[in-house]
Each structure stands twice: as C-alpha cells, then as structure tokens.
Amino acid sequence: MKPPVFPISALIPQVLEVLRQHSRLVLEAPPGAGKTTQVPLALLDAPWLQGRKIILLEPRRVAARSAALFMARQLGEEVGGTVGYRIRFENKVSARTRIEVVTEGILTRMLQDDPMLETVGAILFDEFHERHLSGDLGLALALDVQAQLRDDLRLVVMSATLDGERLARFLDAPRLSSEGRSYPVAVSHFPARRDEALELQVRRAVQQALAEHPGDLLVFLPGQREIARVQAGLQESLDGSVEVLALHG
C-alpha cells in the first residue's frame, strides 16, 4: 500500500530529530494534518525507542479504533499486529503490538500496574486541546514517571487548537507546527422554529441540504439521545439510497 501524503509528512524529519535530542515535544497541527496516524508510525524505527512500545492516547473510543485501523492498513496488517488498541471492554493487542492506541483511563491503569512503564518508550497525547481531567491526570502522571524514574521516556503533546507556545513553556519542551489542509467553506443559516422539536428541525435541515448539495452530511448534536432520535426520524423520512449512521462513544 502506497503511504498517503499528509501535511505533517514534511515535518516528520524535524519531529524525529527533536525527539532524538529531547524527551518532550509539543506538536501543533490542524485537523486533517495526519499527526494522529503518521507520527506514531514514523517513530517505530527510532533508535531511542529500543524496541519499546508507543502509547497513543485518544479521548474517544471511536477515534482510538479508527486510528488503529488506519495505521494497521498502512502497514498492510490486521489490527492487533504491529498496531492495536485497548479501550474499555475491548482489547485488540498481541505480543507483537508496538503501537497501542488507548483511551486515557487505560494509561492510568497501566501506571498502577507498572509505575515505571518499562515496556513503553513514548507516550503521545493526541487532541490535547480537548481538556478534561483524565487527560490532564495522564500527563501529570507521565511527567512524574519521566522526572523520577524514566528520563528516557518520550512525551509528545499533540494539539490542533491549544496555545502551543504556552504549553511548551510549561513543559520546557521544543514546539513544532505543521500546516493543514485548506478547503473552501460557505456558511449559511437554516431558519429555526422555536415551537419545533430539535429532531424535526434537524430533519428539515438535512432534507434541504441533501436536495441542494451532493455528497455526505455530518450533523453535530448535543448527546446520544438526540442522535438516536434524529437517526430514527431520518430513517423514516429518507429513501433507501441515504444511509444514516450514528457516531458516538
């Protein structure tokens, strides 16, 4: 499989050089730049890794599965080989796994079981701009391990929108920035009706968008309940040529 070219690809040599000389890195890259999948793969053969694992932390289970699947396909393998993932109630890793994509609670349990993280050479914190307790705790614990037990442990904080300069100062880490992909965007507003339920408004908006534009739609909703209601309504009102998928978790 020919490796895809991402905006982050041009920055990979600098990432490797920085991590050869430093144990920490702050990497800024917009959505779609390829940081989630291309950076872990690029680090696989780094001499300082010494055969240890790379842990990639994702804030959501869907993202963890998707990232692992994409990287495994790039290597021409199935998930659970060189690349695997671990999330709550689901484990797709093996003795051969070198890149583990995990949700943040998994890292906390790993530290409880192995405080020195002896089998881990690098931890990558993806989407760190989505600040929440689990991610902050994971970074704090990893910094503690690095400072007291494992000065060879590499920590990479990756973000799309967080103030990278401020974070780099806090971590005393080099900072790299990648270009992203640009697409033309047109903003329009759909008239809302105050007396109409959310799912009905979304249904009307989707029907209008499908009638006026080719391609796919991505609809953002507040929670799982709203997603289920909108999905049911769209499946009733749209013909069989439109597939309605619920994405959450």
Where does each model-flagged region fall?
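P-loop NTPase motor module signature
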Residues: 1-249
